Amino acid sequence: MLAFCYSLPNAGDVIKGRVYENDYTLYIYLFDYPHSEAILAEC
């Protein structure tokens, strides 16, 4: 499990979450937003 801390570019808030893998896909789970799992994509 990989933990991360991401600073939003347009706000002073820092988002903390967890990155996990399921069926060869990386997902992000945000601790402050429990229903907001997202697929991790490189932009």
Curated annotation (Swiss-Prot):
Family affiliation: Belongs to the orthopoxvirus OPG041 family.
GO molecular function annotations of the record: peptidase inhibitor activity
What InterPro entries would the database entry show?
K3-like_poxvir (IPR016397), NA-bd_OB-fold (IPR012340)
Which superkingdom?
Viruses
Query: What's the protein called, per UniProt?
Result: Truncated K3L homolog
Origin species: Monkeypox virus
- Output the lineage of the source organism: Viruses, Varidnaviria, Bamfordvirae, Nucleocytoviricota, Pokkesviricetes
